[in-house]
C-alpha cells in the first residue's frame, strides 16, 4: 500500500530495531503488514536491520472446509520465504472468529473429534517454518461466545449489524484462568469487565486444562517441548 511504501516508515523501523537491539536478552519485533502484496511487504520490512518477522494472514483467510485451500495458503506463504524465520503463522486472532468456530464447527464434529482437530491445527501451525502465533483460548480448544447481549457488546460492528453479524466481541471475551467466579475467573479484580465472562469457558479454565491429562493444552505443551528438541523442526529450511 502507499503507506507501507513510504521511505520514512522503513527508516523508522530501522531506528526502532536499534532501540530493541540496545537491550539485553531475547527480543522479537513482528510487524502486522497487509497490502496489495503482503509477501513483498514482508520481504521489504524484514531486510537486515529491520523487523524479525511479519504477521502472515494466509491461514486466517482459510475457510476450513477445503484441504486444497489450506495447502494453497501454506504454499503461497512459504514459496518466497522457504527456510526463513521471518514468517509467522496464525489460525486465529482478535479480528476473526477462533479456529474452533470458523474452521472446525462447520464440519459438524463431536466434541472429542473437534478437540482432536483443534490439536491437529495447532501442531500443524507449529510444524511450519517461522513463528507460531497462538491466539488466547486456542490452546484450551475454546470456541467463540455467540450469545453476548447487544447491550453488552463493545465492537461497533457488532452493535450496528447484530444479529446478522456479531462483530469481533465473540472472540474477545476475557481469558478464563480458573473456575472461581468471584474474581471474574481469575481475569480481573475489577467490579466489571469490558466483556462478560463466558459460562462455557469457565469449564475449560487455563489452570484446570493445564492440569488435566490429555487435554489440548497438555498435549500441545508436550508437543512444543518435543519440537524444541528436534533440530529438523527448529532449523530445517522447509516444512
Positions of the model-derived regions?
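Aromatic- and acidic-residue-enriched carbohydrate-binding clefts of CAZyme catalytic domains
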Residues: 1-7
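Loop/helix patches that line or flank the sugar-binding groove of alpha-linked glycan CAZymes
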Residues: 7, 11-27, 35, 44-56, ...
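Catalytic core of soluble alpha/beta enzymes
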Residues: 39-40
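Conserved NTP/Mg2+-binding pocket subregion across the NTase superfamily
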Residues: 66
